[in-house]
Amino acid sequence: MADRTDMLDGGALAARTLREAGVEVVFALHGGHLDTFLTGCRRYGIRLVDCRHEAAAVNAADGYARSTGRLGVAAVTSGPGLFNSIGGISAAAADGVGVLVITSSPPLGEAETRELQGGLDQIAAVRPITKWAHRVTSTSRIPDLVGLAVRHAQGGQPGPVVLDIPIDVGFTSVDPSKLAAAGKPEIAPRPVPPARSIASLAELIDASERPVVVVGDGSLAMDFRSELDDFAEATGIPVFRSGLSRGGLTHGHKLNAGGIFSLMALPALGAGTPDLVILVGASHGLFLGGRRFYPMCAGAKMAQIHLDAAEILSLIHISEPTRPY
């Protein structure tokens, strides 16, 4: 039996696992259900940023993820706290942003007793707008399930996840040597695309006279900023950004050609239209110029690289579809 001083409560276990995952900051709005988690964040050196509304906390985590390419984490309290955050969770879901929302709920043993901030199935409510949502029922499973939440949020096409740690589970202390087996709270390196796809794309580039690259909102999750710089400089191909992109070439780079509407303006400027468009992490729709984008590229071959296989070939024929894993 561990000495009481060696025991860790559920909130500390959650914070420790997030720190192991590289999390440095959590955006939060305090609620008593979260006390052990917030105390655990201080214990393990995770900076807490206090927010005035739960949706703002999730929006801040979303913005952090978009601007850094790292996991954004928000903490909101039980019941109305989580329901106040649904607008932020929905935005992260729509744009494929990796955000982990830590929440809580009334004690498991008080279900159906008109408990404080209870009475509604939180997980059922957020499941349609998340990649994954789960309620922890055992303190010893917290490291395992926090790690799983991290992998769900960042693996494949990123998106929001919700992990509910009920107040009694979060406040219970356990012997750290007796925890359930847990995987690492990180995603494995992505495999490279098939050699055949790379060779086909290289052939398209060699055969083109006016190729362009369009980088989209998925570029941060794909984490290739330095490679994109190297590619542009080696090929001389200009790089444009879709309306949602926070990636692309570094600011001031000579081949940073601006936003998608700069590309669409080329014919009016007498510059002609591209004969090859390479979409990198760019999703079809309004922020790629909507349906006006496709007539402008009617004579061009299209290549697309995207984490989400369902996004490839949507709305338009792609000459070379490439999934980077």
Sequence positions of predicted segments:
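A general structural motif
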Residues: H53, E112-L116, A188-S200, I260-S262
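Glycine-rich, anion-gripping cofactor-binding loops and their flanking helix/strand elements
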Residues: R66, D217-I305
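N-terminal cofactor/phosphate-binding cores enriched in small/glycine residues
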Residues: L8-S90, A94
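Cofactor-pocket helix-loop regions in the catalytic cores of large enzyme subunits
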Residues: A2-G32, S140-R141, I165-L255
